[in-house]
Amino acid sequence: MFNVSNNVAPSRYQGPSSTSVTPNAFHDVPSLGQKVGAGSQKDVFHSRQDPRQCICLFRPGTTGSIPAEQYAQKELETTKQLKNLGFPVVDAHALVKHQGSVGVAKDFIHNALDSEDIVNNKKSLPDNLKFNKNVLEDCNAIIRRLKNLEVHIEDLQFLVDHNGHVLINDPRDVVRSSPDKSISKVNELRSHALNNLLDIDSD
């Protein structure tokens, strides 16, 4: 049985644990492919070494007083933990470094939609029946698992792939706690798919 941390309350989240990270834990990436995205903390590049992966590097100064190495390690550990708990994730493979920046090598999801762009109405889900059904079904499955395991996922966000499958991306932590806040985050995305399906049915 995979253990879920229960010693950190989500409301008191202070960032990654203080566990030290050995420098040789980070694999050197000699060169980067095309930049394919950017978030609040990381820049994302296509991997030249493995076209199935992308390299996500923390920008300097984006992790506050917490070393970026610890953030990267915690993201890798949490992603693996969620995967072992049966959640769909953008899989993380290794700790990486490039020219002084550190981060994580992850699956490259082609033509992905960011859930934050969807819920903030910056982008829309496609008006496609199967696509929206997949989003709805995946959201329902994630909600069921959150309830069954009684866990909260810190900084829960998703990528939606080109088929409408929903994948947890960039998680900060998973703790034994009320799942209500996490379920609310899932429902934000779910409501967009549901509205699309209602519109399709009315046409």
From Swiss-Prot:
The active site is at D155. Residues 1-23 are annotated as: Disordered. ATP binds at S40, Q41, K42, D107, I109, D114, Q157. Keywords: ATP-binding, Kinase, Nucleotide-binding, Secreted, Transferase, Virulence. Its EC number is 2.7.1.-. The keyword Transferase applies. It catalyses: L-seryl-[protein] + ATP = O-phospho-L-seryl-[protein] + ADP + H(+). One of its GO terms (molecular function) is ATP binding. It is found in: Secreted; Host cell. GO terms for cellular component: extracellular region; host cell. It comes from the Bacteria. Effector protein that targets and inactivates the eukaryotic molecular chaperone HSP90 during infection. HopBF1 is recognized by HSP90 as a host client. As a result, HopBF1 phosphorylates HSP90, leading to the inactivation of the HSP90 ATPase activity and chaperone function. Belongs to the HopBF1 family. NCBIfam families: T3SS_eff_HopBF1. HopBF1 is specific for eukaryotic HSP90, despite the fact that the target Ser is strictly conserved in prokaryotic homologs. This mechanism appears to have evolved to prevent phosphorylation and inactivation of the pathogen's own HSP90. Adopts a minimal and atypical protein kinase fold. This is Type III effector protein HopBF1. The gene is hopBF1.
